[in-house]
């Protein structure tokens, strides 16, 4: 999965109601925003979730002295679904075995895919494009004396 990020019409920042706002366009070939009520099969929400939008913004710029708040998510492309099947490993390596291997003892608990492979179905979104409107709030207790909203805004850009 590949995501692309860009500013919208050159208007990617503004000051509204005393808070710094940004507008960011994101798009990609496929997307999956997992619904937690489906246990084994992965099924996507119809649109990007606010927590996914916040994750994208935090991947671009994160600081302990600020918190991203999502104001609005615009859906630009029609909502379309695809179903895919994937082979996945049905178990994970035990952390104790990894420690043993790190200490030079044992094999680390290798997983042999022929023994634990599982085929899983996923319902994903296809050809997605969103515009995220967001702002950030400051936590002065976690900021240095040189930090400011303007500084964070310029670093995001």
Which sequence ranges carry the predicted segments?
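Beta-strand elements of well-folded, non-transmembrane domains
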Residues: 26-30, 77, 132-140
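Short, positively charged and aromatic/hydrophobic N-terminal segments
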Residues: 3-4, 11
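Methionine residue identity
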Residues: 1-2, 15
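Glycine/small-residue-rich interface belts in oligomeric ring/scaffold proteins
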Residues: 38, 43-88
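Intrinsically disordered, low-complexity polyampholyte segments enriched for Lys and acidic residues
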Residues: 9-12, 16
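N-terminal, Lys/Arg- and Ser/Thr-rich interaction peptides
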Residues: 16-40
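A short, structural micro-pattern
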Residues: 18, 67, 124-128
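Internal, well-folded beta-alpha domain core
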Residues: 88, 98-157
């Amino acid at each position: 999965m590949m995501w692309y990020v860009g500013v919208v019409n050159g208007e990617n920042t503004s000051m509204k109601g005393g808070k710094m706002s940004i507008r960011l366009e994101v798009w990609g070939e496929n997307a999956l925003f997992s619904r937690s009520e489906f246990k084994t099969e992965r099924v996507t929400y119809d649109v990007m979730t606010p927590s996914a939008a916040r994750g994208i913004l935090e991947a671009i710029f994160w600081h302990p002295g600020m918190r991203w708040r999502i104001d609005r998510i615009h859906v630009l492309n029609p909502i379309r679904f695809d179903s895919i099947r994937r082979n996945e490993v049905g178990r994970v390596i035990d952390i104790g075995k990894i420690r043993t291997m790190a200490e030079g003892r044992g094999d680390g608990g290798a997983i042999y895919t022929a023994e634990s492979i599982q085929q899983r179905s996923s319902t994903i979104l296809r050809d997605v494009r969103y515009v995220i409107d967001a702002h950030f709030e400051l936590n002065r207790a976690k900021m240095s004396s040189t930090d400011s909203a303007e500084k964070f805004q310029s670093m995001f850009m």
